[in-house]
């Protein structure tokens, strides 16, 4: 759980770091979007990561 959440944070930092020099506004929007999605859906997405295949994400993400 903690390692998974750490991966989310690392990915957000990496994405924002790559886009920050090009478009700060875009980077901020990405950070906010990822934070909201992570906060609201992390508990729902957690079990999906342990299930095989991308099919497990389909019923979870649109909720």
UniProtKB/Swiss-Prot annotation:
The record's subcellular location field reads: Membrane
Q: What is its main location?
A: membrane
| Membrane topology label | Single-pass membrane protein
Keywords assigned: Membrane, Transmembrane, Transmembrane helix
Q: Name one GO cellular component term.
A: membrane
| Ranges annotated as spanning the membrane | 15-37
Domain of life (superkingdom): Eukaryota
What is the protein's name according to its record? Putative uncharacterized protein YLR402W
Origin organism is: Saccharomyces cerevisiae (strain ATCC 204508 / S288c) (Baker's yeast)
Q: What is the lineage of its organism?
A: Eukaryota, Fungi, Dikarya, Ascomycota, Saccharomycotina
């Amino acid at each position: 759980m903690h390692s998974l959440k750490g991966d989310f944070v690392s990915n957000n930092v990496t994405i924002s770091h790559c886009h920050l020099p090009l478009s700060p506004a875009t980077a901020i929007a990405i950070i906010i979007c990822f934070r909201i999605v992570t906060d609201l859906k992390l508990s729902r997405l957690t079990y999906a990561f342990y299930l095989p295949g991308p099919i497990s994400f389909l019923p979870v993400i649109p909720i």
